[in-house]
């Protein structure tokens, strides 16, 4: 089961990065580092939080909220 959860987390990270890039118009390669260093990514990869059970749109929204809070 652990391998399936890790696979899901990795797939969701990729899908979320694509979603963020599409929304922002940024190159996905530019989004990767920023997303992977974010608190949202850390929470995504913590299986206890259950964030990995959500879809990429939800995770992208969480990331965008995190960025907005840090910018203010």
Where do the model's predicted regions map?
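C-terminal alpha-helical interaction appendages
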Residues: 1-72
